[in-house]
Regions:
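Electropositive phosphate-/nucleotide-binding environments in soluble metabolic enzymes
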Residues: 64, 89, 117-121
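Glycine-rich phosphate-binding active-site loops on the catalytic face of alpha/beta enzymes
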Residues: 1, 45-55, 98-124
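Conserved anion-binding
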Residues: 1-60, 66-80, 90, 127
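Glycine-rich beta-strand-to-loop/alpha-helix junction loops that act as flexible
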Residues: 82-87, 105-107
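Extended, intrinsically disordered, low-complexity segments
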Residues: 128-136
Length: 136
């Protein structure tokens, strides 16, 4: 709590978004148990991501049920939640069911699925059309 208070006391002009690493279980569980602290210190948004891209995607670190419960708790507190972490196009239906505020893709929209490579217009277009077909 002291760290959150210190960060918020800086009065940044830009709203800060704490990134929670889902593949760091101790951190994830600590955050889950203390979500109220983020709201108390006037954070409005959290992002669940993976730290190690080699350890797999977000769903390898968190079950669909766990993510659903995390989203339910954050929504009850008035916090928005984004999901990222080596997400793939075929996971979009599961992600849409969860209804996070933001879904973050990086390697899935880069050439050769390499997050350090250039963006692929074709992959961006495919994901756009996939979203469009899922919500139509």
């Amino acid at each position: 709590s002291k760290l959150l208070a210190d960060i918020k006391s800086c009065n940044f002009k830009t709203e800060l978004v704490p990134v929670i690493f889902a593949d760091k279980k101790i951190i994830l569980e600590t955050v889950f148990k203390n979500l109220e602290s983020f709201k108390a210190f006037k954070f409005n948004f959290l992002l669940l991501d993976t730290f190690s891209k080699k350890s797999g995607d977000l769903f390898k670190s968190c079950s669909l049920n766990y993510l659903s419960n995390f989203l339910i708790r954050t929504k009850k507190l008035g916090l928005s939640l984004g999901l990222a972490g080596k997400l793939k196009k075929n996971q979009i239906p599961k992600l849409l069911k969860l209804q996070p505020k933001i879904i973050g893709f990086r390697s899935a929209v880069c050439k050769k699925n390499n997050r350090n490579d250039q963006l692929s217009y074709l992959k961006l277009q495919n994901i756009y059309h996939y979203f469009k077909s899922e919500i139509s």
